[in-house]
Amino acid sequence: MEFVSMLCLFTFISLTLLLIHSIFKFLAFASKKLPLPPGTLGLPYIGETFQLYSQNPNVFFASKVKKYGSIFKTYILGCPCVMISSPEAAKQVLVTKANLFKPTFPASKERMLGKQAIFFHQGDYHAKLRKLVLQAFKPDSIRNIIPDIESIAITSLESFQGRLINTYQEMKTYTFNVALISIFGKDEFLYREELKKCYYILEKGYNSMPINLPGTLFNKAMKARKELAKIVAKIISTRREMKIDHGDLLGSFMGDKEGLTDEQIADNVIGVIFAARDTTASVLTWILKYLGENPSVLQAVTEEQENIMRKKEVNGEEKVLNWQDTRQMPMTTRVIQETLRVASILSFTFREAVEDVEFEGYLIPKGWKVLPLFRNIHHSPDNFPEPEKFDPSRFEVSPKPNTFMPFGNGVHSCPGNDLAKLEILILVHHLTTKYRWSMVGPQNGIQYGPFALPQNGLPIKLSLKTSST
């Protein structure tokens, strides 16, 4: 009885001290009367969305940083936001204080991709999904689909010959097909056209204003998203009936021990297609542009790739690529890194404050979005001298910590980056060893929204090399 009394007394004292601590913490926080970061919120509801997406993001960010400093507020895509532009602040949001900033997108994007997708979660559920994606996309797994990726690359390049192509659109088809083979394995061939039709409608509404009225891009996109989910459900049902174990991402999601619902699986499949397609296609488009504009770099990459072919001939090996070949491409890898830096396909990422947060002397209210500006960091002369210059040699030495984050940072960094680099290396190998290309039309323009792209998607003409070239 005495023990119970002591336990009750100890519990009471502990709770009292905890309450007093919480009160003092609240009063201390409130007494500071922290201001919001400087900046403007723009027009009601619309905010500064159009200013950001209709011009070079560097211009938007630079004008804000010049006027307000490295942290400022704005309003985009229906959300109040705080943008941060220093490597140290980005590390705090993405790594050091990641528990205070959950991954998020604007509500309209969550609805399109699916609220159960990996991007929007943290904790145990996120850890489980990340483990499953890494399991399917780790080197030991993706090396098995190199023949499939190579076949897609060869077929794609052959289809480009003799016609004027929009590089970005063609690369989207290539990366879409690679995404499907990595998610659905051999089953993708049966559903490719259905999936493509629905996804192409969905993507058109991705950056539209979230007005769900008949005829709007957003409304059409949401209908297409429902159809996509139905197709994925059909594939899941067929697999369960056949009781065949697949070594692809869908098989990983469907594992008996995982306990994922069909809705969770569908949301994450659609999310992975989104993550795997447009960004990688954008990188490939910029690579063709930068190689075309820098003959010495193109020559170095071509020589590296041709050397791989010569070694195979000398050793009597098949000319098909294998995993080891892709590890012998340091120059090409540096070109990819420099393209990721200069183009900065993803200008920023979204996080959300899970509570009122004191950050560098300012208040970030609970629920506000927080955007680390990768583009600003990648284009800062403090981090990369002559930042606008395309110079792959800068990656012969590692960049300073937290200054190069093309795939994000921390536990929410992109788990599919090995697959993305692999499919780029494979296509560049066949492109540089077999083809030559020329850019057509204006070459200095850039179009924005949602990704920065060469004007008109980089129109090019591709031709097969002859033995004399």
From Swiss-Prot:
One GO CC term, this protein: membrane
Cofactor(s) needed: heme
Source domain of life: Eukaryota
Keyword Membrane carried by entry: yes
Result of knocking out the encoding gene: Silenced plants fruits have a rapid ripening with a quick colouring and associated with higher abscisic acid (ABA) levels. When disrupted in fruits, altered expression of ABA-responsive and ripening-related genes.
Keywords in alphabetical order: Heme, Iron, Membrane, Metal-binding, Monooxygenase, Oxidoreductase, Transmembrane, Transmembrane helix
GO biological-process terms attached to the record: abscisic acid catabolic process; abscisic acid metabolic process; fruit ripening; response to abscisic acid; response to water deprivation
Functional note: Negative regulator of fruit ripening involved in the oxidative degradation of abscisic acid (ABA).
Family to which the UniProt record says this protein belongs: Belongs to the cytochrome P450 family.
Protein name in the entry: Abscisic acid 8'-hydroxylase CYP707A2
Organism annotation: Solanum lycopersicum
